[in-house]
Amino acid sequence: MESFEGQGDSRQSPDNERGDNVQTTGEHDQDPGPGPPSSGASERLVPEESYSRDQQPWGQSRGDENRGWMQRIRRRRRRRAALSGHLLDTEDNVPPWLPPHDIAPYVARNIRDAACRAVKQSHLQALSNLILDSGLDTQHILCFVMAARQRLQDIRRGPLVVEGGVGWRHWLLTSPSQSWPMGYRTATLRTLTPVPNRVGADSIMLTATFGCQNAARTLNTFSATVWTPPHAGPREQERYAREAEVRFLRGKWQRRYRRIYDLIELCGSLHHIWQNLLQTEENLLDFVRFMGVMSSCNNPAVNYWFHKTIGNFKPYYPWNAPPNENPYHARRGIKEHVIQNAFRKAQIQGLSMLATVGEPRGDATSETSSDEDTGRQGSDVELESSDDELPYIDPNMEPVQQRPVMFVSRVPAKKPRKLPWPTPKTHPVKRTNVKTSDRSDKAEAQSTPERPGPSEQSSVTVEPAHPTPVEMPMVILHQPPPVPKPVPVKPTPPPSRRRRGACVVYDDDVIEVIDVETTEDSSSVSQPNKPHRKHQDGFQRSGRRQKRAAPPTVSPSDTGPPAAGPPAAGPPAAGPHILTPPSARPRIMAPPVVRMFMRERQLPQSTGRKPQCFWEMRASREITQMQQEPSSHLQSATQPTMPRPSWVPSVCALSVMDAGKAQPIQSSHLSSMSPTQPISHEEQPRYEDPDAPLDLSLHPDVAAPPAPRAPYQGYQEQPAPQAPYQGYQEQPAPQAPYQGYQEQPAPQAPYQGYQEQPAPQAPYQGYQEQPPPQAPYQGYQEQPAPQAPYQGYQEPPAHGLQSSSYPGYAGPWTPRSQHPCYRHPWAPWSQDPVHGHTQGPWDPRAPHLPPQWDGSAGHGQDQVSQFPHLQSETGPPRLQLSSVPLVSSSAPSWSSPQPRAPIRPIPTRFPPPPMPLQDSMAVGCDSSGTACPSMPFASDYSQGAFTPLDINATTPKRPRVEESSHGPARCSQATAEAQEILSDNSEISVFPKDAKQTDYDASTESELD
């Protein structure tokens, strides 16, 4: 990279010489920096420069020169680097995408209103179903709208593909079969964190992933690097708490006061609001009342909000006009004493005056608009009614509390539809005994049967020819509803290719091949109960979809003979169907009813927990099928099959069978996170079993121990077939795709008997024959990583280091082995023990667990008792290794129970925390005011709810070389403080004990920022 030094960059060049010629470099330097403004003066002054500089005291002139000079140099270098793109990287440097126009910071309401306006267009109807019909609050609407916005922007300019994949993870989401209807699209967006007015905003990358019905099948899906907001210090947490509390209180105020709150927050100028933004006299008086409440309010959070917003601590009352002016309210015709009375009354009543008087809280949940809204605020009513059809939006107005009529979809399908006009069904004619002539009776009786349905004229009472007075009230005849003639049901034609469910799978799919003919018995037996059961799967929830998918479900009384229906959909009363053998009949696609319940048919009917996803249903079905004999297909569906076993993982990778060629397809295409798929190793999904304690002596990647063998102690002395071939452990997968395995000369001996090994070790077999694997090293993926508790870092035997008898020991720390030349070239990180946890390059095979520590070094025990909350959980530490030097400063927390079953660690990128997580919500961080349900940044506010509170973990240092450095880690004075802070009786607080927390309202304005 070139050094950015021009002519004037050396410190020796005189102060006012322009370092670069503006014409040659093309820089246009608007700010020449300190120094005489005329560049023409420089030639004249150069010879006398040294003399004039000598007249000043030397240090002062050097200081001035350096200050001004270096500023200018830095500015010039910065600009030059930015122009040539050197700050980022030299080749194909793309400047970050910026919006083409200036963007005003969004107000949440504006975005929401824009969403309401947008969904008037017909092609955005789906968006309106998603956003408006679900009655969400503004925050959720914003999430949806931002996602849609990203999607649109991403269509406009293609996806941002980072070449090296720096900080990005992406999967290729391919659907293996043409007909799988679900595709994924993502959109990314560079935006700023929502800091008001963009002071101190961070640039972050947002990503939305959309599933689309018939998307293109191969698309890169990116998910951005995770951005976590920086942890807030105690003052910020206090501020967040106050702001959240005020927002919570505002939600409980009447709408007119909420509006004034919003105006003050938007404008920040009371005078401007008073003069320009209040429309009716009632609005003006509301403002006066609000100011009265604020002037007497003693809630610290509201006080803080008010003074922070208006920008000073002594509010001025805008109705007090200067003496030479006619005050504004007088011009509006409001008397002075009215204003004074309203103000005093509000001062006396305080905050309770603003609260709603028993009206429902109308924040997008209540569908009713309360009377006080419409009655009190005439101005808003005029605004809203200016256009009756569409919701009207005024920038100063909160959106209507009532759902606009245009968005009401339709009444739910369960109730019969109420028509607004009278019909014979809704308004049956009152039956009164009116005398009519016999002739009209006969005419009526003759004409009735031909009428297709009862109409209002024909439904007049039909009386018997000889009425008896007793029977008169009872002989009112209703015409019986016409019985539908049983129509023979034709087998429905093969359906169109239109896909309906979220993940509906048809019989020609590769994902799951269900052959209707092969399972006639089970399908025909288990089908009848289906229409009478509540649907258990989430795919068939909407009535509309069922009505479309199924032929009309006919109750047994209505149908004709049972054989009339298609073979799989007979009524429950039907006997066993006579089915032609599958070879004889033409292969038709399953009729829609079968398709509707196709996957559900094989599920156990237990009322246990419902399967959440397709793979889970698939897994539980296969498991129950394995447990039944093939003969048990004939058992009736009323008898429930085995419930889903609790150990079935929620996502399991099953090899699926292709319809034509019955060979298993690797299902790693089907789910991007299936456990067998070789995802990049930072993404390796892990499952945890919540009850087993975190057993840190075990290697995190041991999935399940193959065959019960002797527990893991001295691996080195065992015969070769079971030795974990030490040459293997240092090899972190990500660096090189394992070509090195074949060439390694040193570790030949342990490999000896690999082909003869018993079955439990099956994944390793054929090791020498493996060709160097392809890019994602598919062939390698099932090998359980070396089954040894991390043996430290072992040099390969060729280096001649003896390895001692217990597994945690890695040889003495000789300076020779630490030297970067001598350590093994693939050793993932440096050789020296570190205090606390280092974060090495993440290699799932070799986590760097600090060795165990026994209490042998003198003052060990009281150091253990220093953590009272630890003692209660784990009991006295059971120490497994006898003579390992202490390496970690928080050693006692590593004492772990004896290895039981290997657990599957939590999916996280970071090494396990050095102390058990403590939810400091319980410990209590000093908050002002109530705990607010709508509080943002809850984790920040709770002092980082999931940060380990390890106070005396020092920053990682290199160990001292004296032998005493292997005793317990030296604790600085921080440990003494930590002991006070963590002792039983004291609550954990972030401040030292004597510092009193200052109140914001007492502090000056500059401190607030």
Curated annotation (Swiss-Prot):
Residues 479-495, 563-574, 899-916 have a biased composition (Pro residues). It comes from the Viruses. Residues 710-769, 776-798, 876-898 have a biased composition (Low complexity). Keywords: G1/S host cell cycle checkpoint dysregulation by virus, Host nucleus, Host-virus interaction, Modulation of host cell apoptosis by virus, Modulation of host cell cycle by virus, Repeat, Transcription, Transcription regulation, Viral latency, Viral latency initiation and maintenance. InterPro entries: EBNA-3/4/6. It is found in: Host nucleus; Host nucleus matrix. One of its GO terms (biological process) is symbiont-mediated perturbation of host apoptosis. Residues 381-391 have a biased composition (Acidic residues). Residues 1-70, 356-504, 516-646, 663-922, 948-971, 984-1009 are annotated as: Disordered. Residues 445-461, 622-641, 664-679, 862-874 have a biased composition (Polar residues). GO terms for cellular component: host cell nuclear matrix. Pfam families: EBV-NA3 (PF05009). Signal peptide: none annotated. Residues 12-31, 680-689 have a biased composition (Basic and acidic residues). Belongs to the herpesviridae EBNA-6 family. Plays an essential role for the activation and immortalization of human B-cells. Represses transcription of viral promoters TP1 and Cp through interaction with host RBPJ, and inhibits EBNA2-mediated activation of these promoters. Targets host chromatin through interactions with host transcription factors, especially RBPJ and IRF4. Alternatively, EBNA6 also regulates the transcription of the EBV oncogene LMP1 in a cell cycle-dependent manner. Interacts with host CTPB1; this interaction leads to gene repression, but also seems to interfere with the repressive function of CtBP pre-bound to DNA, leading to EBNA6 mediated up-regulation of many host genes. Interacts with host MYC; this interaction enhances MYC stability. Interacts (via N-terminus) with host RBPJ. Interacts (via N-terminus) with host histone H2AX; this interaction facilitates H2AX proteasomal degradation. Interacts with host TP73; this interaction inhibits TP73-mediated apoptotic pathway. This is Epstein-Barr nuclear antigen 6. It comes from Epstein-Barr virus (strain GD1) (HHV-4).
